[in-house]
């Protein structure tokens, strides 16, 4: 379990490195933006974005809001978005994009606490996935439900 590809991004801050990672989900190459601290990773925050397509896309500034010097922060783009293969699927295949990413992170950083933050669409994604994952906490932020 690992990333297929890691591409360094041209974003410079003193405490973290930014990479666009690619990982395999359902035989598709799915991408995410990840900021990894230069120091030991003690905590992981998985930011599940809202919106569809380019609306609500994952941005470095949003990830930076959740970081400290020992926190890895990652936001999956979801299939069909920002160079990820496949078709954007609300609450179907995109759930697998989240679960596989968390499984990879847990295998790479087994001692780190994993926290999920889901906004809008990501809020419901988190509700549908967090109970089956090695996650220590979950925050739903304005999730839509019926």
Feature locations, PLM:
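Alpha/beta-hydrolase active-site loop
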Residues: 89-108
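Glycine-rich nucleophile elbow surrounding the catalytic serine of serine-hydrolase chemistry
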Residues: 118-128
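Alpha/beta-hydrolase fold nucleophile elbow
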Residues: 109-120
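Glycine-rich "HGGG/HGxG" loop immediately N-terminal to the catalytic nucleophile
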Residues: 80-91
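N-terminal cap/lid segment of alpha/beta-hydrolase-fold proteins
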Residues: 2-38
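Short amphipathic alpha-helix adjacent to the substrate-entry channel of hydrolases
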Residues: 57-75
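Short beta-strand element of the alpha/beta-hydrolase
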Residues: 42-51
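Hydrolase active-site cap/lid region
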Residues: 128-146
């Amino acid at each position: 379990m690992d990333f297929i590809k890691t591409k360094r991004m041209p974003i410079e801050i003193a405490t973290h490195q930014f990479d666009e990672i690619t990982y395999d989900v359902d035989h598709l190459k799915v991408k995410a933006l990840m900021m990894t601290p230069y120091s030991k990773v003690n905590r992981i925050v998985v930011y599940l974005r809202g919106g569809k397509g380019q609306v609500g896309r994952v941005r470095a500034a949003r990830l930076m809001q959740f970081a400290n010097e020992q926190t890895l922060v990652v936001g999956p783009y979801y299939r069909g978005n920002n160079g990820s293969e496949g078709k954007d699927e609300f609450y179907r295949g995109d759930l697998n994009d989240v679960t596989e990413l968390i499984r990879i992170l847990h295998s790479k950083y087994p001692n780190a606490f994993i926290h999920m933050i889901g906004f809008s669409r990501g809020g419901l994604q988190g509700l549908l996935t967090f109970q089956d994952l090695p996650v220590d906490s979950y925050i739903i932020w304005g999730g839509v439900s019926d």
